[in-house]
């Protein structure tokens, strides 16, 4: 099941294995950890540049005690929360989170979130994403991607390909 919800109404997962080193697992502490150690400022910049979450990158949450707890997508959720409400940005990081336009605020104010029934149902998803990981393209496939999209200047420009791929 999927619902449309504001990222501000989502809770970051206090049981996320990334946060094992945190002594306090309040939402503000989790956000500070994510911006300090998990490159969330860059992710917020990327979301701001793109204008929304990338297609296919839906957040996954559990419905627990009348709250929605993110089990997959804590970094994306944190980024969106800080883009939507600058008061949530931890001290010392405001200069690293871009100011957003009205259109981006509109695009990100309500997002589609997949809802799972219990934490056990999230285990397979988390394993595939964080332990097995997405299989990277081999070098030849990467070359083919750039060649097919550049097409001797008839397709994307080198600048556009660099912006799209980060290479």
Predicted features along the sequence, with ranges:
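Short, charged/polar connector segments at secondary-structure boundaries
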Residues: 1-101, 109-113
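Amphipathic, charge-rich alpha-helical segments that serve as recognition/docking helices
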Residues: 26, 31, 94-167
């Amino acid at each position: 099941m999927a619902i449309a919800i504001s990222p501000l109404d989502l809770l970051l997962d206090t049981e996320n294995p990334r946060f094992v080193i945190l002594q306090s697992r309040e939402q503000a502490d989790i956000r500070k950890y994510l911006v300090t150690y998990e490159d969330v400022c860059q992710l917020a910049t990327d979301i701001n540049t793109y204008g929304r979450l990338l297609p296919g990158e839906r957040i996954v949450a559990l419905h627990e005690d009348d709250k929605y707890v993110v089990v997959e997508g804590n970094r994306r959720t944190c980024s969106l929360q800080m883009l939507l409400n600058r008061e949530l940005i931890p001290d010392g990081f405001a200069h690293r989170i871009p100011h957003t336009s009205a259109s981006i605020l509109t695009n990100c104010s309500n997002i589609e979130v997949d809802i799972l029934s219990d934490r056990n149902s999230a285990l397979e998803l988390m394993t595939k994403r964080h332990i097995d990981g997405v299989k990277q393209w081999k070098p030849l496939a990467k070359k083919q991607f750039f060649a097919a999209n550049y097409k001797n200047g008839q397709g994307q420009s080198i600048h556009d390909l660099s912006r799209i791929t980060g290479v």
